[in-house]
């Protein structure tokens, strides 16, 4: 099977000759930018640069998928948020555009033609050509809870969820249309799966809030997005996995704050699991021994797609990601062609 076929099979919890190896979020590091001579912020703003940098997820790192939307701000920028696109060592950041959840949300009729959306849409098409069907091309959108943070500001949005819950729900009904439109446009441009990132982690959203505000929203997104959907939520999500498994979404990309064994138990048999490898302990500071131990743990409990827990830190050495890929292939029955595992970065 081609790497992309393995990735998509594992999203559906179907048999494959080895585990999937990939990430629903960014795997870009500063030394990976150096390796392919493409850097932020240009790779956020130019489709060809974005596609070249995303392709390195396979051509340099060896992952089974590529994902070109490195930032969290693309659709929010297209909505009208002012965004500082950062630099090589700095992630983008943006400013809210409304002062109250009661403000009327205006979705621009040309949303998908604005650079925030148009650039990654073009990059997805370029990636499909570059990868030639060998690996899975994955898109990424943000759910209406996170878009609420962006357009209203985190503090204002969270306070409103307590004091004006009906207004928040009305706002989310409007913002869900942005998520759906951008997701399905990405599919039309070549995405074979979509990451749905929604920052409803424990410190910002209680499990009851997830149940009351987000469960139905995520169920609806599963129905309206026309491909397998990978939900990504940072942090310890053990207290809401019982609800996440009710969404019908294909896969959950989980944080190392939930142990792999607990995540597998709580997810049940239908929900595929991806990730769970610590960015700090393994991706940034791992040794061959610690990487092997981590992958063995994931494989023993049935994690479908191994890889980083979240967007990789920019200062992590990409060689550790390459080592993770080689170890995962060797331990799950598909050793590297040279039978030589890449050595992790030595500090």
Regions found by a protein language model. Give the residues of each.
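Active-site loop segments of alpha/beta catalytic cores
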Residues: 1-31, 109-347
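Intrinsic-disorder/low-complexity, polar/charged segments
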Residues: 45-48, 97-102, 114, 166, ...
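Generic internal hydrophobic packing segments that stabilize the cores of diverse globular domains
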Residues: 51-55, 63, 117-124
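Pocket-flanking alpha-helical
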Residues: 33, 77-80, 127
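Active-site-flanking structural segment that lines cofactor/substrate pockets
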Residues: 29-61
